[in-house]
Every structure is written in C-alpha cells, then in structure tokens.
Amino acid sequence: MASMGTLAFDEYGRPFLIIKDQDRKSRLMGLEALKSHIMAAKAVANTMRTSLGPNGLDKMMVDKDGDVTVTNDGATILSMMDVDHQIAKLMVELSKSQDDEIGDGTTGVVVLAGALLEEAEQLLDRGIHPIRIADGYEQAARVAIEHLDKISDSVLVDIKDTEPLIQTAKTTLGSKVVNSCHRQMAEIAVNAVLTVADMERRDVDFELIKVEGKVGGRLEDTKLIKGVIVDKDFSHPQMPKKVEDAKIAILTCPFEPPKPKTKHKLDVTSVEDYKALQKYEKEKFEEMIQQIKETGANLAICQWGFDDEANHLLLQNNLPAVRWVGGPEIELIAIATGGRIVPRFSELTAEKLGFAGLVQEISFGTTKDKMLVIEQCKNSRAVTIFIRGGNKMIIEEAKRSLHDALCVIRNLIRDNRVVYGGGAAEISCALAVSQEADKCPTLEQYAMRAFADALEVIPMALSENSGMNPIQTMTEVRARQVKEMNPALGIDCLHKGTNDMKQQHVIETLIGKKQQISLATQMVRMILKIDDIRKPGESEE
C-alpha cells in the first residue's frame, strides 16, 4: 500500500514531508501487516507440508542455470526456493538454523511455525491482542518442552550394541530417496560416527567423516571405508596400481627445482646454455627423488603438480606419486596415516612419513574414472562413506540423507534421550498443553489451546501424506492415547497394523524435538510483534 504518511504543518499552516521520498515508499500497518506476514508463512509451510514423513513427496527444484535438484530435505528445498517476501526469507533461516544445530526435522519446524501462525490469525480475527497470543504461545511451549522430558526414554549408546542407534537412523532415512536400503545406510552411518566419536567428551568431529560419491552401480553398493578415498590416480599410467605397507611423504611444497623468491629472468643464448639448464633441472629432480627415497618413503602425495620429465624420473626410480591433491584431502590423509604435512623439501624426515597398509587405484566400469583408496591406516579415526548411484541427483540426495542420519546419531551420543515419532510426541504434548490451558485463568488460555491445535497439524499431515483420512485417524489416535495413557501411540504411516511407535521402532531424538518446538515458537513470537512495514518504493530512473 503506497502511503503519503502523516503530514506535519509549520506555524503558517503549510504542510511539509518529514521522511525523504515518503510519497514513493510503501507501508503496511497493524493487522494488515500481520495478515500479510501470516499469508507468506502459510504459503511456505503448505509447500513443505506434503514432504513430511515416510510417505512425503519430493520436490524438483530448478535453479537459474537450469540445474535440476530432486530432494525431500526441508533445508535444501527452502534454500533453493527463490522467495521474495521478507517473512518467507525468515522461514528459510528458521529451517537453516534447525539444520545447522540438529541436522534433522527441518521440514517439521517450518510446518509447525506455519500452523502456529494460522491459528494466531483466527485469534487475531476474534480481537485478541498479538502480544497476548505471543505470551500464550511462550507458556504453551514451556509446558510442551517439560512434557517431552517426562515422556522421553533413554537408549543405551554402546559400541557393542548399536541396534537402538540404527533404529533411530532408520527413522530419519525413512522419508528419503534411500529408503529402499535404509537399513544398510543406517548401519553405515552408525559405524562411521562410532569410529570417529570421542566417547569421553561425548562429541563427534564431522571433519573426520568424508562423504564421496561416484555415478554408476546401485545405492546398495555404497560402503564405508576405514580410510580415505581421493578422486585422483597415480601420476603415470605405468606406475603400480597397488602399494602395500605404504610409507607416505605428504608434500605441500612444489616438486620442482628451487627458484629465487625475487623477480628474475634467465638469459639462454646458446644450445649449450639450454642443455646446461636441462641437465641442472634433471640433476635437481633426481636429487629430490633420492631425498624422498632416503627417508624410506615409497609413495609421494603432492598438493602441487610436477612436469612430465619429473613424472618420468619418478617412474624410473620406482617411486609412485599422486599430484594435484586438494588441501582438505591432504589434511585428511595426514590425520588418517599419522603423517606430518611437509611444507619445505629440506624438512622431510622419516618421522614425518604417514603409514597405510594398502594404497590402491580402483577403476569404475568401462569409463576411465579412477580413484585412490588409502586403507588400513595408522589412525583408524578417519573414515569415508563411498556412495554409488544411478545418476548425480540420487548421489547428491543420498549425501544429504546421510548428513541427516549422521547428525541424529551425533545428537544421541550427546544426549541419549529419545521420544517416539509418527506424531506420537506432538499428540501427547498437545494433550498436555490443552490440560494446562484449562487451568490458565487469563486470556492466554486461548493461545495455549491454539498452540495445542497447531501441534496436531504434524500428525494430520503425516496421515494425509499416507493416504488416510487425517481428521478421523487423528481423533482415533488421540482418544487411544488418553484411554491407554500411552504417549508412544502415533500415526501408522507404513500400514504395519499397530499405532505403537515403540513396537515399530520409530524413534526421534529428544533434543531435536525440543529444538523444533522452541525455534518455531521464537520465530512466531517475533512475527506477531511486527506491526509496521516500510519498504522503499520503486526507484525512479
């Protein structure tokens, strides 16, 4: 709405404008501003709603360059959405913060925030002040989070018995593209995390888990490698394809004759000068190769390249080498093999070599694609998950799915309490909030009831996406939860014949669920407190 704004008058009664270009600015105020925000948030939430749960549908996102991404991951969908409205951008940030902190539940948090705003709209229409709604939501969120603590169960995080961890990872992977082999993927994710986890600090360093993918093969061919995979091959095709008991020199210095640091030029006036230069370079290369071999190294990994002459000399001297290895890979190789990165050639000693039981080059299908696998390393706390798939899109989606699973297992190691999925926790919290609302003597009880209704949107979306009647299914499960006093009863999305999520092993982490409720509530409170928007108008050329 374009607004001229309020005019001020001088002592002679002449009008003047206070704000620059006030006539070209657009402005929304009061309820109109709130309704605009709620409409934008609902539009984003409704887009995400169909992606929720094991039967959630995927979205195809096409970017400006025409690249296609098919995904079910809430954070990815929102980050690729080209949103223009400022509140829709806040929803994108909300999903991102859930992804950064927890890694899973990115779709649910947006759907919940959208439902809370939808309920708030009805309360605003009844004349309740937005601040009272925001305060009621805050009280309700506190009740829901306390109730989650009461209904949570602890799982045993034990390296010997990984079944509870695998079941939790399977719940996360159930809604993804990889659900055809989600048991295998869950086992890979659990083994990867437990290999690198620091159980004393109860933390996981994700830098030690590398996820690589290669087009070809099936998703079932995905495997966990206790070591490092590098997307490179040996520098010369005649070098051996396998090096056993490898002692690795990890070089980040250029593999070439030394050059002066200052600006210089070399005058070559005759053939003899050129031959002398060639001879000097060859001698220097041989000297450098000899220096590497004297330390006991039988494999050189270089961050920089070297020319064909050096490559030929390396082959003659039986020293396999790999060139142009990136910085992160060099660091991971150093961690895995227990070696030290050598920035200057003169500093190379036997103590700085890394050790690996086997380094081999593997080929894929009929293509010329090759990769290096460094296994049986000195330090087994660096692992690589190697994903295969029919096309690039499937591999990228599998990477995102595994990221969610890895995050969930890390959260369980940090805090081993869980709640039950399938909407069971949300229904139980909604019942607890409704009971608490009846005890609230002030106007906030309306907002608390609205909060309970909003929580029920998640189980309703789950049943809707599974092809059931959402309202009928929801009322049946809610009635059973009250009658049987069992907070583990949820929506039977997979049609297994039981609503008990404990029997179905549908498990979610407690910290993830708490974070969902608190983040969505904070976001909605912030939106409800905005009553005025000023936007710059179109600039006149």
Swiss-Prot record:
The modification N-acetylalanine is found at A2. Ubiquitinated by the DCX(DCAF12) complex specifically recognizes the diglutamate (Glu-Glu) at the C-terminus, leading to its degradation. There is a cross-link at K20, K210, K214, K265, K275, K279, K392 (Glycyl lysine isopeptide (Lys-Gly) (interchain with G-Cter in SUMO2)). GO terms for cellular component: cell body; centrosome; chaperonin-containing T-complex; cytosol; extracellular exosome; microtubule. SUPFAM superfamilies: GroEL apical domain-like, GroEL equatorial domain-like, GroEL-intermediate domain like. One of its GO terms (molecular function) is ATP binding. It catalyses: ATP + H2O = ADP + phosphate + H(+). Its EC number is 3.6.1.-. Induction: Down-regulated in response to enterovirus 71 (EV71) infection (at protein level). Changing K176R: Found in a patient with severe developmental delay, intellectual disability, pyramidal and cerebellar signs, visual impairment, polymicrogyria and pontocerebellar hypoplasia; uncertain significance; the orthologous yeast mutation induces yeast lethality suggesting loss of function. Pfam families: Cpn60_TCP1. CDD domains: TCP1_epsilon. It is an enzyme of class 3 (hydrolase). Transmembrane segments: none annotated. ATP binds at G53, T106, T107, G422. ADP binds at G53, G105, T106, T107, S175, G422, D492, E508, K513. The keyword Acetylation applies. Component of the chaperonin-containing T-complex (TRiC), a molecular chaperone complex that assists the folding of actin, tubulin and other proteins upon ATP hydrolysis. The TRiC complex mediates the folding of WRAP53/TCAB1, thereby regulating telomere maintenance. As part of the TRiC complex may play a role in the assembly of BBSome, a complex involved in ciliogenesis regulating transports vesicles to the cilia. Component of the chaperonin-containing T-complex (TRiC), a hexadecamer composed of two identical back-to-back stacked rings enclosing a protein folding chamber. Each ring is made up of eight different subunits: TCP1/CCT1, CCT2, CCT3, CCT4, CCT5, CCT6A/CCT6, CCT7, CCT8. Interacts with PACRG. Interacts with DNAAF4. Interacts with DLEC1. Interacts with SPMAP2. Belongs to the TCP-1 chaperonin family. This is T-complex protein 1 subunit epsilon. It comes from Homo sapiens (Human).
